Curated annotation (Swiss-Prot):
Matches recorded under InterPro entries: RsmH, SAM-dep_MeTrfase_MraW_recog, SAM-dependent_MTases_sf
Major localization listed first in the record, in broad terms: cytoplasm
EC number(s) on file: 2.1.1.199
Catalytic activity: cytidine(1402) in 16S rRNA + S-adenosyl-L-methionine = N(4)-methylcytidine(1402) in 16S rRNA + S-adenosyl-L-homocysteine + H(+)
Protein source organism: Shewanella amazonensis (strain ATCC BAA-1098 / SB2B)
Gene, per the UniProt record: rsmH
Keywords for this protein: Cytoplasm, Methyltransferase, rRNA processing, S-adenosyl-L-methionine, Transferase
Entry protein name: Ribosomal RNA small subunit methyltransferase H
NCBIfam families in the cross-refs: 16S rRNA (cytosine(1402)-N(4))-methyltransferase RsmH (TIGR00006)
Residues that, per the record, bind S-adenosyl-L-methionine: 35-37, 55, 80, 102, 109
Family: Belongs to the methyltransferase superfamily. RsmH family.
TM annotation in the entry: none
Amino acid sequence: MSQDFAHLSVLLAETVDGLNIRADGIYIDGTFGRGGHSREVLSRLGVDGRLIAIDRDPQAIKAAEQFANDSRFQIVHGGFGQLANYVEELGLVGKIDGVLLDLGVSSPQLDDAERGFSFLRDGPLDMRMDNSQGETAAQWLARAEIEDMAWVFKTYGEERNARHIARCIAADREKTPFTRTKQLADLIARVAKSKERNKHPATRVFQAIRIYINSELEQIDQALEGALKVLAPHGRLSIISFHSLEDRIVKRFIRRHSQGEELPHGLPVTEAQLNKSRTLMPVGKAMKPSDVEIEQNARARSSVLRVAERLPF
């Protein structure tokens, strides 16, 4: 049994501030984790408020037992990409006042060697957010073609040595299958042609495999579209990203829906037509953690918070 690992929620106050909490509102925490953001949301809700939390990690579902006696709270075991489906089942489409997403892997997942996310701790090569189902990283590495591995490393890890590393993995697995995180990390450290200062050579490959195994970017796309569908007028989106691939998706989504559809040039357009084509309004600028927060929690360094509001048109 894995021990319980602590988790410091990044940009905690700022993210919940972004939701502009109403005491009687209905909110979604799409990435419950260990409940840091949920706890803060609940502290700002009144007796008639409601919080629906979602997580696909069985350990997160167990952690949600801390709120078992709070009638305002409920937890759903599943991926945040399906949030629109869960809301539809509850009959709450168009009634959600805010959606919070804290993307990427959590500290407890990284710190628990048995989960297989970290190249700094030796453990089984798993990397599944929901370790009760799906293909493990070890299983994928055992069957993937060189071209497929190279594509994943390049696309999801922006790894410059993607093809070379893929070839080396394919050659080594003929002798010994990759089953441990240290085994893979040591190989990458040995064969990487170029190394980045203050970054372990395996960082990008581990990120890439994790994103691929968990379909993380597809989940983000689905969650954003789903959030837009379920938000009430003036409902808020408050989203924390941890690397450029995540943030790019969020930034482009907000930009696309705040600029609206492209309308014919040279033809008269009514204000109603302009408004109808816009569904979101950015709230403030992208926010990064303070130096104080980074000093207290080094993993906050790369985080970016973006907030947007559902327009009432």
